[in-house]
Amino acid sequence: MISPLAYVDPGAKIGKNVTIQPFAYIEKDVEIGDDCIIMAYASVLNGTRMGKGNKIHHHAVLG
């Protein structure tokens, strides 16, 4: 489920069964694997590639 309060760039590749919580920020050149959780206020920046089953905690910045 992707929260309507999260920003996910249309160019990001999001896997199956991914949870993106409110106010998370996902940039364009990002790949998020299946079964990942992006918690509130986390940022995933351009060039980041995440495999399956990762959990990114509140306010974390990747990339």
Protein language model regions, located:
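A structural motif detector for beta-strand N-caps
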Residues: 6, 12, 17-20, 24, ...
